Amino acid sequence: SLAGNLEGYVIGLTYKRKQETSMARHRRTHPFRDSRQDIETARDIPDTAQTRAPSYKLAFADEAFMEREELRPVRLQLELLKPQLLMDEYGVESTVVLFGGARIPEPEKKAQAKTPYLAELSRYYDEARRFARMVTERSLAMGGKRDIVVTGGGPGVMEAGNRGAQEAGGISIGLNIVLPHEQAPNAYVTPDLCFNFHYFAIRKMHFLMRANAICVFPGGFGTLDEMFESLTLIQTGRMKPVPFLLFGRAFWERIINWQALADAGTIGPDDLKLITYVETAEEAFEVFCAAEGACGDQTTS
């Protein structure tokens, strides 16, 4: 809606001003010329055979050089660093992660679903939307820096999460990735917190680095990949345990036989306790708040 978009714009503008203030605090104090000055100077140099040669370009401003195979370690570092810096400047302290299928339509459009079962799953669009709204309202009551909703920034469940956060008047994060069939990010991601990735691995790190809870809705290969990597990190002690909520017991038990893994001994009986099934936004919110301390304690941090 126009009101929702305007509210989201105002929230984004407020945070952008905070970001500019933060950047001002981090301006350099050393006497050396900075990189931006030299980029501008290099644009105005005389046009000669030497200055047109690729070798003459400043290394950090040379796209062809940055795309070389040998520069992969640098590109990995940049993809880790850029979102980290921008989220820090926005004051993002922690997140609530929403994983879920891009093909799940909102209920009003379920007639367009590719299969009858996808149409049935459309109710999880509303659950994700309501849950994100509840989490964001709680976050705003605590100062708006903790438990920021983060999604993959695409359609389906991801759109629902960002949409619910915007409807609550808060910000949300979208971690997109370049895919052959990918379209633009959904319109509900806070623009200054909408990121684009080349590396799946770095993208998944940013999903989990600040996570206070992980919520998994029905989805496909991407959702399964994100779910199993998150579970593996928690199971192996590489990540602290956080509430791990699976929306839709019937869906998950239909495609994954967790008990069979335990019976086979390939996972331990206690590993089954890592996940909690929920059906509604309200149920998930109650579990999340209980794990965080108390739903009623919403003091500003």
What are the residue ranges of the model-derived segments?
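Glycine-rich beta-alpha loop segments
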Residues: 29-46, 50-59, 63-175
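C-terminal functional extensions of proteins
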Residues: 246-301
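Short, Lys/Arg-enriched N-terminal segments with co-localized hydrophobic residues
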Residues: 1-22
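Phosphate/pyrophosphate-binding betaalpha-module
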Residues: 149-151, 155-217, 221-222, 228
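C-terminal amphipathic helix plus adjacent low-complexity
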Residues: 25-28, 33-40, 288-301
